Amino acid sequence: QLGLEVAAIDEEKARQYKAAVGKGVVITQVKSGSAAAFAGLREGMIIYEVNRVSVNTVSEFNQALKESEKTKKVLLLVKVGRYTQYVVLSLKP
């Protein structure tokens, strides 16, 4: 629904994306024209939270997303460069 794919951060991805192993999930793909693309999310960004719930695995990320199907909005805490910021995405019905 968001138009993105994520992966857990293992040692290889931690080196590749300058991230901590097991802390957050990394965006590996963003579909053009999707809610994620519209919000400015890009490959390589790290997602630490979904709706203020910490996510460190793909299954935690997916579970947290399921919780937001009712509200049709998703609040992500994302690492952008050296900083973190909140990004709001609207889910398509």
Give names to the regions the model predicted.
Residues 1-93:
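C-terminal recognition in membrane/secretory proteostasis and scaffolding
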